[in-house]
Amino acid sequence: LVLCGAVPVYVNPEVDKRLGISLGMKREQVEKAIKEHPNAVAVLVNNPTYYGICSDLRAIVKMAHDAGMLCLADEAHGTHFYFGNGLPVSAMAAGADMASVSMHKSGGSLTQSSLLLIGPNVHPGYVRQIINLTQTTSGSYLLMSSLDISRRNLALRGRQVFHQVADMAEYAREEINAVGGYYAFGKELCNGNSVFDFDTTKLSVHTLDIGLAGIEVYDILRDEYDIQIEFG
């Protein structure tokens, strides 16, 4: 933002008060922001959020394009959307113009490696020029090799792997919710707007109903059960 001089306009999503997490962007919120700022050049959307919440990306892309704007997607946690049956729509399939995909998060490549996907409305030569101005021209061949190896692995096994992951996460959700006191949320949050879709490979567990904060459960699982979770 500093380098390009852009002035951001934030669309604040709703918050689920019970879970304490941000939801997706409502269609009417995006439409209102576009109408109030007709000179904006792009709309930036998370697909999904950290907790697996997805906005109505196809509708947002259409609104942006109808207003002469690009739609850019932060798909840091959505690598697997390109390989999963029954998973939310990927940014490029929804018609987004660019998507940053963190392959190292769920695609299996080395940390720091990611992909920038470009649609037909964006000139790749211009993107290359900007990249050369903002980062090293001496790229890491170790990271690039890991991206290519991971790409091949996903091309060959991605659908099978992520189908299995989704099944395992759904099984865990059912078992955790059967215990009582915990809430592993899933597609029941979907409301057709601020939660348009949900990433079923995500396993997030609300623990406050048993009197424990997430960080406390994190420490218990790690210290007493040798289970390392991602975030608490």
Model-derived features: where do they sit?
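Conserved PLP-anchoring active-site segment centered on the Schiff-base-forming lysine
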Residues: L1-V2
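A short helix->loop->beta-strand "cap" motif at the edges of active sites that frequently abuts
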Residues: A6, D66-M69, A96
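Hydrophobic beta-strand scaffold residues
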Residues: P8, C71-L72, I229
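Active-site phosphate-binding strand-loop segment of PLP-dependent enzymes
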Residues: L19-H80
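Active-site PLP attachment segment
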Residues: S90-Q129, Q135-S146
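Structural signature of PLP-dependent enzymes
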Residues: S150-R173
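Conserved C-terminal alpha-helix-loop-beta "cap" of PLP-dependent enzymes
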Residues: E170-G232
